[in-house]
Amino acid sequence: MNFLFMIFLDGSLGHELLERSKKKFKGTWSAQFLLKESHLISEVYDEYIDAGSEVITTNTYSTIPSYLSKDGLEDEMVNLIRKAGEIAKNTALKYEGKIKVAGSIPPLDESYRPDLVHDLEQSLEVYEVLIKELDPYVDFYLCETISSIQETINVLESLKRFNSGKPVWLSWSLEDFNSNKLRSGEGIEAAFLEAEQYNPEAYLFNCTDPDSISKGLIELQKLTNKKIGAYPNVFSVPLGWTLDNEIKNQVRDLSKDAFVESVSYTHLTLPTIYSV
């Protein structure tokens, strides 16, 4: 990985918003804050930027039917996506061109669950709305927590058909515990070769144990000269975990040396971590 040129992303929105709010939103996760306490989203962005982030990510990870339906908010999807885009864009504008906005394109069902990945036609229907409504607000698209080759195809094909001309960053989630395979068990090289047909600008890993990410980056370096990066979890994800069930994840503390091996951190990481 080329450490002479680094881009610092932001970190977790969902956990940080929940911590500040002291409320327990489960079903719709961070999307609830677009309806209530939306000022907190801007505050979190500002703190990440003050700590060195050069990119902020739209709060659209859970503005999709699978999450919104848990609270009967499916009809609010378009409005919530637009509001998320506006908040991110308005925050970036305050910094006079120094901050880029990444449009978050998430899995369409639970994260970390390749067994729940939709087929292409089902995915196109939802991604089309998300991409179309985000496009006026973002500088590039960040496909996050992608867990299989099929999900890779689903999201990249959707972006190709929309044809916005904006860069695409593709971020896979790997199996935890020092693995270099996607959560589907498929290899990084196989996923990369499929993705290259769509020519994304950058490849990343996210929502994964740091040890697996370190191993994955070594392999990714051998495959491409494009931008590569990572934003790991500080916990490991057990099999069968979902946002709503009671299966507990295992939190890990990391040293500063382990931190700087990655471009950014994600879930359960706070703005203050960046000021090391």
Predicted regions: what is each one?
Residues 2-35, 61-68, 97-120, 172-179, ...:
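N-terminal small/glycine-rich loop or linker at the start of catalytic domains
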Residues 11, 48, 88, 141, ...:
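Conserved, mostly hydrophobic/aromatic
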Residues 29-35, 55-77, 142-152:
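Glycine-rich, proline-tolerant flexible connector loops at the mouths of alpha/beta enzymes
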Residues 55, 81, 85-131, 140:
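Active-site beta->alpha loop and helix N-cap motifs at the rims of alpha/beta catalytic domains
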Residues 73-94, 156-170, 223-228:
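Alpha-helix-loop-beta-strand connector modules within alpha/beta enzyme cores
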Residues 142-153, 204-219, 275:
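Active-site glycine- and acidic-residue-rich loops that bind
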Residues 175-183, 187-265:
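Catalytic-face loop-and-helix region of soluble metabolic enzyme cores
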Residues 267-276:
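Single conserved hydrophobic/aromatic residue that forms the stacking wall/gate
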